[in-house]
Structures are given as C-alpha cells and as structure tokens.
C-alpha cells in the first residue's frame, strides 16, 4: 500500500466520448479543480464513428497537467490516479512504436454489423449471452477488433507474433502513462468487450476462435482497485510517478461513486438517453427482460455483478421540444412550463424516435402522442415529454427488480436532467421509491477517485466514503398507489400502440 500521509489529493481522469477531463479531489472528496478538452469526432461514412487515439492521449495528458496547475499543486502531492472511460471503444497499437494502426473505433460505430450477423448465423447468440452477459451487437469491442484485423493488411499475423496490442481506452491511457510498461484493463471494461467470460473471469476461447482474434494482443485483466503501475509525469522516471490505482468503465464508476455497492442499490444517469445499473452482488443475474448482465465494483473494487438497461431517448426528447417544435427556448425552461399545469391532461408522449430500448426492444416502434383533445396546451405536451423520461425509467427498473428478485431501496441519480425538480419528484412518485440527488455532480469521476483512494489507503474504507457521499436532496414519493397504477396503465397502453409502427416500411 502506498504511503499517503503527505499526499492530500486524488486525480480522476474521465475520458469521455466527446472530451477528456481531469478532476482533482481532496481528502473530503471536494472538487478542487477541473480541466477539460474536447477532441475531434470523425465520421468516415454514415453510421461510422472514429477517434484519433493520439488526440485522446494528448487531450487527456494535457488536462492532467492543467488540473494540477489550477489546483496549485505538485504531482508529488497526489496519492493516486483513478481512470474512468467511455466503454467498448477499441484501440489497436504497435507495441514497439506505441502508434495506433487505425483510428479508435467508437462504441457508437455500426460498421461491424455484418460480422454480428455472421455470429448469429453461426448460432453463437446463446453462448454470448451465457458467457459474456451481453447480446451480439456492434456496440461491443469484439467485432470492432475483428474489423480492424480484417482490414489492416498483415495486422492479424503481427498480433499473433505479439507485435500489436488491443485495449479499451483505459488500457491505451495506462500504456501511454507508464511509457509502455503496463498493458492492463479492469473487469468492468473487459466485461464490455463481448470476449470476456464474466463467470470464469477470463477471455473466452470459443469467441476468440470464432472471431480469429489472437489472445496475445489482449490485456491482462485486473480488479478495479489496485496499483497497476506509475504515471511518469513531465519526463520523470517511474519511481517519481503517481500510482495508477483505479479503473472502471463510466457507468460502473458512476454506480460506485453513488456508493451503490450492495445488492438492490441502483442508479440512473439522465443524459441524452438514460443508463440504469442495479447492483446484484455476488450473483450474476440473467435477465428475462432484455437487460444486460455486467460486472460492477464490489465494496473494495472487487468483482460484483449488475443488471444494466439503456433508454434511447431522455434528454433528447426535451431537445426535440426545443429544436424541432420550438416550444421552449432552453431545456431548463421545461420545468417552469411543466409546473404551470396540474397534470398532462391525459396526454402521453412516447419518444420512440429511434425505436424502443429495454425492456421492449422494438426497433420498429415510433414516437407518438396519445390523448390529444382541444383542451391540450403546449404546457401539457412539455409536461408529457418530461413524464416520458420517468415512465421509461420505471419500465427498466421494474424489469430489473423482477429479474433480481430485489426491491430497489432508493434510486441515486446523476446527469444533466437531475436539476429538474419536477422530473425528480414525478420519478419518485411513479416508482414509489425515494430518489436521492447527490451534492457532488461529478459522480463518475468520484467513483474512479474512490477506487484509487481505497487501493492506496488514502481513504480507509467504505464507512469513510459513505460519510462523504452527501445527498443534496431526497425526493420522497407523494402519490397514492391508486394514482400510480392509473398513470402507469395509461403509459403502457400508449407504448403498446406505438409498437411495430414501422414494421412494413
């Protein structure tokens, strides 16, 4: 364990889809400084998304230096670095030169759809579900790796000879920070590759063979909270470096940042869409409702399991009101207009603009508004749009609770939309469960910092961290069971009528 008596800070590196950030935190988990750099989004053709790994590295290393400078501290005062990252995004690089052989293929990229269809034709769906907890989809890293090896001449043979390395973004950053000494990932990121057996905690031989991916190129998989190596800062040597001591994929880091480390604890990140995770403890629960089974962080960063569900349209629904319908000038205005009316006047808005995600999984569903009468005003539509976010969250959480056999104790929330008090209260009313909004908004970074701090003894354990997980406001349910059932029944009827709309197109 690292000696941290004279070290008063932890740095979290938050490498996201559109920007790289560095956050300095003190012993009380207060944010001391934040530095952020956006980087280029590359769209070679429709449905393809790439990043330049060297630009990711340049922006991330720059934010680290800037955040320390802003805080007015020296790197020798930092006890550890924790890393959280966009998941699934795939980097393959030359072991000798440290240069990527191709741009990073981003999690959003759909170029490997044909490879996924091949896997389905080869009857691998059940094997993927059973071993990895995932579904066959271009979203995950496995088919992205195969695509690069298929399209960069000689790369597969070089990978077999140990000349090329694969990593998700965490692996790439650690390789660069340790000057090529360390090639690792953690269990949460490995679990999103569609190559990792989440039960045996090892790379799956059958999937590697099916995709012709050489095992030699894969990183060592470690826990989410331990010292992996040391970041060499400003040309210094390894002995002078900062311990890199925490890794978690962004959603799992947020779950840990919320201190959702016990079975039945869950969080929802309200962004463009929503990401819901519920801790299921030592039990890997197989979903009967289209949810993913994934690895989360246990109380000390060890392996725990979680159910994960994604909602496609949440904040994007409010953006639609603003940009296309011109009903509001600013997303923040939605709360004001929603509270000008007592209810939605019987209106339900189903925001299936790109189909419906969990638990319906209907790509042919389309957006619809139901219950329109002459008495419906713009305010009612705005309210119905906000309510749709809460209804969709309830659908996923109901599925999670049925799958896990666990009743949600409280829902921890983060993301841009949580500042909307109306939405948070309506969410609590629909769930019949308290909704807890944290005081610290940097929950994902907090999770990475906690993992690094635990590994180095900077923080003593969960009890100390729980004292720091301050809740700014608890939204208690204030709705009768009869009213809740009536609202939910109307929503379910609306969803049913929006389904399979585009099936014949």
Swiss-Prot record:
Keyword Transferase in record: yes
Disulfide bridge positions per record: none
Binding site for sn-glycerol 3-phosphate: 17, 87-88, 139, 250
Enzyme class: transferase
GO cellular component, one term: cytosol
Pathway in which the depicted protein is active: Polyol metabolism; glycerol degradation via glycerol kinase pathway; sn-glycerol 3-phosphate from glycerol: step 1/1
Catalytic activity: glycerol + ATP = sn-glycerol 3-phosphate + ADP + H(+)
Residues holding ADP: 17, 21, 272, 315, 416, 420
Example GO biological process: glycerol catabolic process
Sites where the protein binds glycerol: 87-88, 139, 250-251
Alphabetical list of Gene3D superfamilies matching this protein: 3.30.420.40
UniProt binding sites for ATP: 17-19, 272, 315, 319, 416
PANTHER family reported in the protein's UniProt record: GLYCEROL KINASE (PTHR10196:SF69), SUGAR KINASE (PTHR10196)
Function: Key enzyme in the regulation of glycerol uptake and metabolism. Catalyzes the phosphorylation of glycerol to yield sn-glycerol 3-phosphate.
HAMAP family hit by this protein: Glycerol_kin (MF_00186)
UniProt protein name: Glycerol kinase
Species, as recorded: Azotobacter vinelandii (strain DJ / ATCC BAA-1303)
Lineage, top ranks: Bacteria, Pseudomonadati, Pseudomonadota, Gammaproteobacteria, Pseudomonadales
